[in-house]
């Protein structure tokens, strides 16, 4: 774990694929956000999701959403999915842990 951030990041294969498909400027903004402010305080920057996506959080980056899970016990933020808002909540709620 880095001394600079209280949390470290894990990116799922789905989120990595999402990043590759994003426009370059959006992808760069998402990476900067994930490895910067999000790791400092993931509870503050996102909002908790409900219903089928309970246990996940979502943070805005323009028209895009970064969906992530927080593991406080291991000080880890797992990036699950990155997509336009209109598609970001249609994901399968079953996710690796």
Swiss-Prot record:
SUPFAM superfamilies associated with the record: RelE-like (SSF143011)
Gene Ontology terms: biological process: mRNA catabolic process; negative regulation of growth; RNA catabolic process
Protein name in UniProt: Toxin RelE
Keyword Chloroplast: no
Subunit structure: Interacts with cognate antitoxin RelB, which neutralizes the toxin. Also interacts with non-cognate antitoxin RelF in vitro, in M.smegmatis coexpression of these 2 genes increases the toxicity of RelE.
Keywords per UniProt: DNA-binding, Hydrolase, Nuclease, Repressor, Toxin-antitoxin system, Transcription, Transcription regulation
An example Gene Ontology molecular-function term: DNA binding
Induction data: Expressed in log phase cells (at protein level). Induced by rifampicin treatment. Expressed in human macrophages 110 hours after infection. Induced in the lungs of mice infected for 4 weeks. A member of the relBE operon.
Xref: InterPro entries: RelE/ParE_toxin, RelE/ParE_toxin_dom_sf
UniProt keyword Transcription, yes or no: yes
Family under the similarity heading: Belongs to the RelE toxin family.
EC number: 3.1.-.-
Coiled coil ranges: none
Gene designation per UniProt: relE
Recorded phenotype for the gene knockout or disruption: No visible phenotype in culture or upon infection of mice.
Lineage top rank: taxon: Bacteria
Database matches in Gene3D superfamilies: RelE-like
